[in-house]
Amino acid sequence: MIKRVALAFSLLLSSILPATAGDVNVPVEAYKLKNGLRVILSRDNAVPVVTVYMIYDVGARSEEKGRTGFAHLFEHMMFEGSANAPKGVHNKMVESNGGVFNGSTHPDFTDYYEVIPSNKLATALWLESDRMRNLSINEENLKNQKEAVKQERRLSFDNQPYNTAIVDVWPTLMFHNWQSSHSLIGSFEDLNGATLADVSKFFKTYYAPDNAALVIVGDIQNAEAKKLIETYFGDIPSQPIPKRPDLTEPADFKAVTQVQKDPLAQVPAVILGYPGPKRRSPDYYALHMIDAILTGGDSSRFKLDLVKGKESIISYEAELGWPFASARDYRDPEPYAMFLVYKPNFTAAQIVDQAQEEIAKLQNQPVDAKELERVKTLVRAGAIKEMQSSQNRAQALAQFELADGNAELINTELDRVLAVTPAQIQAAAKKYLLPEKRAVLEIQPAPAQAPKGGN
C-alpha cells in the first residue's frame, strides 16, 4: 500500500545508509541476465534468513491521464495469483515457512519482498518469477481489487484527518507537471473505468524483466543463488523498455498559498514546501543536513525553539520527498517539505513565519561546528540502526540500481552526507528555501460533514 511518511528523520536515516564515514562495506555483486533483469546479490550469513526484493521501474508518476491509481491497483493485483500459484498460494507458501511479505507503491517505483528462511530461497524466487511471467489477470480479480483499493482509500485517506489534503491537494501546489501533481492514490472515477485490456497492457508494458531489478540480501552462497535465478527468471521474455515520463518542472516556481477545510481535523496544520535540488547533487546532501538540523531528534531547532520555546508546534514531519516517500524513492524532481501541526491559539501565518525564521538563521549564519558535529553523530547512529534490517538494505540497493544505475552507491552515500560543510548548508538554504519559492497549504478544522464514500 502507499503509506504517508510517519517520521521524516527516520526516513532520512534510511536514505543515507549505515555506519561511520569510510566504514560502509555492504557486499555487492551486480550483474544482468540476458533478458535484461538486473540482479544484485549481497551476502550476509549472520542469520539463516534471506530477503528477496523485486522492484519494478514504474510508479504513480508513470501513470497516464484517465488512469490514475493504476500503479497502486497493480500492486494489489500482484497478490491475486499467477499461472502456477493460484490466489492465496503466495501468502500460504511464505507464511507457512515462517516468512513475511508485502508490496508498496512509490512515486517512481513499485516493490515487492519476501523475508524467508534461507533454505526456502527457491520458493520465493519461484513465486516472484511466476507472477512476473504470467499473472492471473481476469475480470473477477480486477473487480475485487478495484473495491479493495477504494476501501483502502476510504479508510486510510478519505476518513483520516489531513490525508485528503495531503494526497489530493498538496501535489497540485507543489508541482506543475501533471505526472507529479495528480493524486498518487488515484480517483474512484479512473478506478471504475479501468478495463481488463487496460490492466493487461499495464502489466505487459511495465512488469518485464528488463524493467526490473532483483535483489537478494542475506544467507546465500552467490554461485548457488545465481543458478536458481537463472532457472526461474532466465527464460522470461523481455519487452521493449517503456519510455519514462517527462517530469520536468518549470524553473520559475512562484509562491502559492491555499486554505483547505478538513472536518476530520481536530487542530490546524500547515504544509510548507520548496522545489528541491537534483538527486545526488551537492545541494541534495546539504538539504539532508538542513533537515536533520531543523527536525532531527530532541535537540533539533524545531523541537527546542518551536515545540518547547514558543510552544506553538504540536508535532512535525519533514523530508526531501515528503509525504509519499523518502529521498531515495524519487527521481528528479523532489521537493523539500514539512508538515506542522500547531496549537489553535496560533495562526497559520504565524507558524509559517516561525518556520521561515528558523530557516533564515541557517541562511544568515553558518551552523556552528559543534552543533553540526552533534547532528552528524545522530545521523550516523541512526543510520547504523536503520541498516540492521536486511529489507532496508535490499531496498536501498534496488533503488540505487534503478535510479542511479549503480547499487554500489550504498557504500558511499553516507560519506557524502557527512562531508557536508557549514558553507554548503548556508548556500543551499539561501538557494532553495526562499519564501518567494514556497508552496503553503493551510489545513483548517471545519464543521463535521457526512463521511466520504465514493463507489
What are these regions (language model features)?
Residues 1-4:
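Positively charged n-region of N-terminal signal peptides that target proteins for export
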Residues 19-60, 86-120, 156-211, 235-281, ...:
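Non-catalytic beta-strand/loop surface segments
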Residues 59-67:
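Short pre-active-site segment immediately N-terminal to the catalytic Zn-binding motif
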Residues 80-84, 132-141, 367:
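Short, polar/flexible loop-turn hinges at active-site or ligand-entry regions and domain interfaces
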Residues 139, 146, 154-155, 200-232, ...:
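Non-catalytic, conformational "gating/processing" segments within enzyme and secreted inhibitor domains
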